[in-house]
Swiss-Prot record:
Protein name: Membrane protein insertase YidC
Known role: Required for the insertion and/or proper folding and/or complex formation of integral membrane proteins into the membrane. Involved in integration of membrane proteins that insert both dependently and independently of the Sec translocase complex, as well as at least some lipoproteins. Aids folding of multispanning membrane proteins.
Chain intervals for the UniProt region annotation (Disordered): 42-66
Pfam family, one: YidC_periplas
Transmembrane segments: 1-21, 341-361, 367-387, 437-457, 468-488, 515-535
Membrane-topology annotation of the record: Multi-pass membrane protein
Matching CDD domains: 5TM_YidC_Alb3, EcYidC-like_peri
Length: 560
């Protein structure tokens, strides 16, 4: 029966690793994006003179009619002067042609740990990469649906900055056409990654005005610049949406390649997800919108929505708005903004285990202030929770070690007659009250916790560039010197020495290979995950040594 234990452990190891690889196949990107050399060396902030994005491409502006094709628009001259806005957490550039956000930096999140002055760039439309947030007014009289192209807005300043002591910053872009005055207003708040984008329509044309507000995210097919170099760290890169009838629906690039999505929904949100960061358009909850995904003529992927018809009588004024979130996947903040938006922190199919783990880990961190020590304390708590199961397992192993001479005698007696050997072993186990599979139970129970913690460490932006101590400066990437994986392999070897030797030579060889196999797998795993496994193994060794010695002492005492 001991062969079952060996096979089970080996199968769990293989299945766990295959699941990680499968996760990458399903949600990861095969190649990382080609980085713009100039962008990698620029100083922090948004550079001057970056060309504005394409304003007149037909695929940029959706049709207000859910049954029709995207509107065909003629291009107009591109804007050369971007409007720059800076708050304490955002640095962005707005193209006056259409009022799209074509660049966006996150100064609180450095692109690389060794260059803290260079912020991570979420949006970019000036080089080899395309990722931007677009919005406008389409429909019967919408200025973004004109044959001459999208509107050219004017701003009072070329740059805006949230001053010290200022809690809110408002940036107004103005445009007039045929007696209708438009103000596209961007409202920013201190310390917040969400902003309000509103349209104030003043109809002085003498005729009724009607149109629709649209908002969308456009991205090319390049890889995820926020993913790390550790094995198994490529998370989902693609679109997602939420509706009351279908909460949290992923729409991958492959899905968009197969055909666009078009649905009538109420409220909800549309988003683009990547490792650690998310961008989402959130319309008014009461609006009935047409959500659409499609691919434009340049091969860019688009997810967005078109709102209901807006009617403005002659001489009347109307305001319509939407919220844009562009920043880190901070669960507490996302949950406040819109129902289901926190699900963009994708913990996989074990989310119901991962979410409580993160909640507990976050509370531990609030006391300790270090994510590495928080992982260690979390491991101790999890180990304490599983102690009754572990103790039963170690008692079973200790009894197995005690009957090892009897098992060897059975092997000598029955030789190659495996059927009689198995029957004799079962009788011996029954007599000695030993469960031969008892040692597997903690592994079975802890494996879902291990995988859930893997996704917590992988998906939680709080782990990004989080140091522990000494050479571990980032728990979300691999150990740069492979010290933790080697320690983990050593602890597995020690733990193996405490276990009874399998009676079959082939089983024994397989078990001896397990520390080497696991060490190889863990060389490229996130350091935080390896830290958890090292601490878990050390605690297991201590528990097993203590229980084994107690049982051996009791056995000797009974024999005396």
């Amino acid at each position: 029966m001991d062969i079952k234990r060996t096979i089970l452990i080996a199968a769990l190891a293989v299945v766990s690793y295959v699941m990680v690889l499968k996760w990458n196949d399903d949600y990861g990107q095969a190649a990382l994006p080609t980085q713009n050399t100039a962008a990698s060396t620029v100083a922090p902030g948004l550079p001057d003179g970056v060309p504005a994005g394409n304003n007149g491409a037909s695929a940029d502006v959706p049709s207000a009619n859910a049954e029709s094709s995207p509107a065909e628009l003629a291009p107009v001259a591109l804007s050369k002067d971007l409007i720059r806005v800076k708050t304490d957490v955002l640095e962005l550039a707005i193209d006056p042609v259409g009022g799209d956000i074509v660049q966006l930096n996150l100064p609180k999140y450095p692109r690389r740990q060794d260059h803290p002055d260079i912020p991570f760039q979420l949006f970019d439309n000036g080089g080899e990469r395309v990722y931007l947030a677009q919005s406008g007014l389409t429909g019967a009289n919408g200025p973004d649906a004109r044959a001459s192209g999208r509107p050219l807005y004017a701003a009072e300043q070329k740059s805006y900055q949230l001053a010290d002591g200022q809690e809110q910053l408002v940036v107004d872009l103005k445009f007039s056409d045929n007696g209708v005055n438009y103000i596209k207003r961007f409202s920013f708040k201190r310390g917040e990654y969400d902003l309000n984008v509103s349209y104030l329509i003043d109809n002085q044309s003498g005729q009724a005005w009607s149109g629709n507000m649209f908002a969308q995210l456009k991205r090319d097919a390049s890889g995820d610049p926020s993913s790390s170099t550790a094995t198994g760290t490529a998370t989902y890169l693609g679109a997602a949406l939420w509706t009351a009838s279908e909460p949290y629906k992923k729409v991958s690039m492959k899905d968009i390649d197969k055909g666009g999505l078009k649905e009538n929904v109420s409220g909800g949100w549309v988003a683009w997800l990547q490792h650690y960061f998310v961008t989402a358009w959130i319309p008014a909850k009461s609006d009935n919108n047409v959500v659409q995904t499609r691919k434009d003529s340049q091969g860019n992927y688009i997810i967005g929505y078109t709102g209901p018809v807006i009617s403005v009588p002659a001489g009347g004024k109307v305001e319509t708005s939407a919220m844009l979130y562009a920043g880190p996947k901070i669960q507490s903040k996302l949950k406040e903004l819109s129902p289901g938006l926190e699900l963009t922190v994708d913990y996989g199919f074990l989310w119901f285990i991962a979410q409580p783990i993160f909640w507990l880990l976050q509370h531990i961190h609030s006391l300790l202030g270090n994510w590495g020590w928080s992982i260690i304390v979390l491991t101790m708590l999890i180990k304490g929770l599983f102690f009754p199961l572990s103790a039963a397992s170690y008692r079973s192993m200790a009894r197995m070690r005690a009957v090892a001479p009897k098992l060897a005698a059975l092997k000598e007696r029955f030789g190659d007659d495996r059927q009689k050997m198995s029957q004799a072993m079962m009788e011996l186990y029954k007599k000695e009250k030993i469960n031969p599979l008892g040692g597997c139970l903690p592994i079975l129970v802890q494996m879902p916790v291990f995988l859930a913690l893997y996704w917590v460490l992988l998906e939680s932006v709080e782990m990004r560039q989080a140091p522990w101590m000494l050479w571990i400066t980032d728990l979300s990437i691999k150990d740069p010197f492979f010290i933790l994986p080697i320690i983990m392999g050593a602890t597995m070897f020690i733990q193996q020495r405490l276990n009874p030797t399998p009676p079959d030579p082939m089983q024994a060889k397989v078990m001896k290979m397990m520390p080497i196999i696991f060490t190889f797998f863990f060389l490229w795993f996130p350091a935080g995950l390896v830290l958890y496994w090292v601490v878990n193994n050390c605690l297991s060794i201590s528990q097993q040594w203590y229980i084994t010695r107690r049982i051996e002492a009791a056995t000797k005492k009974a024999a005396a």
